[in-house]
Amino acid sequence: MPMILGYWDIRGLAHAIRLLLEYTDSSYEEKKYTMGDAPDYDRSQWLNEKFKLGLDFPNLPYLIDGAHKITQSNAILCYIARKHNLCGETEEEKIRVDILENQTMDNHMQLGMICYNPEFEKLKPKYLEELPEKLKLYSEFLGKRPWFAGNKITFVDFLVYDVLDLHRIFEPKCLDAFPNLKDFISRFEGLEKISAYMKSSRFLPRPVFSKMAVWGNK
């Protein structure tokens, strides 16, 4: 039985999950929900099913794998990663994984907060002003390692890739001062399974956010 990944028909919080499912050659199907247009942004496609799936904390995204029913995007990533030993091996690697799992969510949410804000155009300049310092921390944390936890890829590389790629879409030149981050992106996109997925009709890089967002809704 293939796993079922449920989410809106956008990139959003499912991008890293989809990438990890593809990288691990997992058998899965997607259940994509469509949100209505403005002004109502009808969510009935999801709400009609929300409490009928046996989820403990009903939300999107969700992953159903037989008896295992999981919500929360990072919990889903961890579940898939544990199956494939992609959580780090040494204590040092696991610490780095734990830090990045949370740091990437912070940065994802920070971008989301301004992109959904009606005052987006006013907030954007300050966000861009502060962005290099945020990216510098990632650059220094990666250093000369091939992957963020160490010599082997882990699930947080999928999260970091998502955050860096989002910011590359937001401001195309934002990574120019950080060659090791650009190299990391090239390395990640060069992975055989990832490269094949990005060329397939299943790949969904946009819309980044839902129809309610001011930026990234197309």
From Swiss-Prot:
The modification Phosphothreonine is found at T34. Pfam families: GST_C, GST_N. One of its GO terms (molecular function) is protein homodimerization activity. Residues 90-208 form the GST C-terminal domain. SUPFAM superfamilies: GST C-terminal domain-like (SSF47616), Thioredoxin-like (SSF52833). It is found in: Cytoplasm. One of its GO terms (biological process) is glutathione derivative biosynthetic process. Its main location: cytoplasm. Liver (at protein level). Glutathione binds at Y7, W8, R43, S44, Q45, W46, K50, N59, L60, Q72, S73. Residues 2-88 form the GST N-terminal domain. Homodimer. Conjugation of reduced glutathione to a wide number of exogenous and endogenous hydrophobic electrophiles. Involved in the formation of glutathione conjugates of both prostaglandin A2 (PGA2) and prostaglandin J2 (PGJ2). Participates in the formation of novel hepoxilin regioisomers. Belongs to the GST superfamily. Mu family. This is Glutathione S-transferase Mu 1. The gene is GSTM1.
